[in-house]
């Protein structure tokens, strides 16, 4: 791809003209229900060079996301999994829409 412009901050290139094979995420609610929100304490020294190393935090488990086949999981050189939380937002949007349809059906 040529002439790609990097965008700083939380902006993500998302132009429809750059995409193909666009489909709605199926069974998003089931996928979200399979994930668990957790509280945890980082092990000493992790994440490396982070101000929250050894402190309490909240998050999800990368291996759970990966097992669902969702995008946004990568591995560090050390083999640790990372999660791109912003890649989960489209799944959550579709899950909310599925849940909303269920609520509407009750009316």
Explain the meaning of each model-derived region:
Residues 1-85, 102-106:
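C-terminal intramolecular chaperone/autoprocessing and neck/assembly modules of extracellular spikes
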Residues 89, 93-107:
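Long amphipathic alpha-helical coiled-coil
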